[in-house]
């Protein structure tokens, strides 16, 4: 309709009416950058999206960059969820001018909620992977230790997020996981990390302190670039190439449990179970 905007405007003026304010937007593309069509069935329905994430995440996805042809496929869901959570959290620390520019202001009609969740969607999917959780009750056992006082009743959004994380993991992450064995260089670093984690208090929940230990191991063992060290952790332990901050995961999963997971990775147990 873009080429006809001027025609529409002239017709409105001829009839004595105010021309409409036009807004041009792009349609979605699939993961290969091709146009989505009903014939190909290469898109995502609203119902499918809402099986794995809250409606607000879809609102954010639609709100952002409407003039850009965005790729719409299942892999974008976790990012949309965590971006939504980031916007909601940041809203409450912003001044009025910044708040109005925040997508959360528009999604929630000027009144975004507070304290939705202390844990990101990406971390929850990793927690599902590491704990082999089939039900959200197991996830809540870890969450309760990490954030005492946090319950399904106090954080209903997080309760729904646990359901979404389990569903998304089972349908999209689990089928594509590719575990591998640690190399000799990585094995030495894993063993060092196990020792460092075992030296920390069992009830530590400071993700940054744990992250510093993980970072130090990578530096001490000469990983260059350092992201190769974190890539190795995720490939050996989770069967994926990347993920959220490892220290934060260990804080939620527990340092003793993370140490045990590292030992299983070294023993090849995760490779056998895949």
How does the language model describe each region?
Residues 19-22, 235:
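Beta-sheet entry/capping signal
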Residues 13-20, 224-225:
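Secondary-structure transition/capping motifs at alpha-helix termini
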Residues 13, 51, 219:
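Short polybasic/polar patches that bind polyanions
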Residues 1-2:
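N-terminal catalytic cores of NTP/NDP-binding nucleotidyl/phosphoryl-transfer enzymes
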């Amino acid at each position: 309709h873009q080429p006809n905007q001027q025609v529409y405007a002239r017709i409105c003026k001829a009839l004595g009416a105010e021309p409409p304010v036009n807004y041009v937007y792009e349609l979605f593309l699939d993961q290969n950058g091709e146009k989505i069509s009903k014939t190909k069935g290469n898109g995502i329905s609203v119902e499918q999206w809402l099986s794995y994430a809250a409606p607000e995440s879809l609102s954010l996805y639609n709100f952002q960059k409407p003039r850009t042809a965005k790729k719409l496929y299942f892999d974008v869901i976790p990012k949309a969820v965590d971006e939504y959570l980031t916007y909601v959290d940041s809203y409450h620390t912003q001044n009025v001018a910044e708040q109005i520019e925040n997508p959360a202001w528009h999604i929630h009609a000027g009144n975004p909620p507070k304290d939705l969740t202390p844990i990101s969607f990406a971390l929850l999917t990793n927690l599902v992977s590491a704990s082999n959780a089939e039900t959200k009750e197991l996830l809540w056992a870890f969450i309760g230790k990490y954030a005492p006082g946090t319950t399904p009743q106090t954080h209903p959004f997080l309760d729904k997020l646990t359901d979404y994380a389990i569903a998304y993991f089972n349908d999209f992450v689990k089928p594509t996981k590719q575990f591998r064995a640690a190399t000799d260089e990585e094995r030495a670093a894993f063993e060092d990390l196990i020792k460092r984690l075992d030296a920390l208090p069992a009830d530590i929940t400071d993700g940054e302190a744990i992250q510093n230990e993980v970072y130090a191991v990578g530096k001490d063992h000469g990983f260059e670039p350092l992201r190769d060290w974190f890539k190795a952790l995720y490939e050996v332990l989770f069967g994926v190439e990347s993920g959220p901050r490892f220290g934060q995961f260990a804080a939620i999963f527990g340092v003793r449990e993370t140490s045990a997971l590292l030992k299983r990775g070294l023993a090849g147990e995760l490779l056998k179970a895949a």
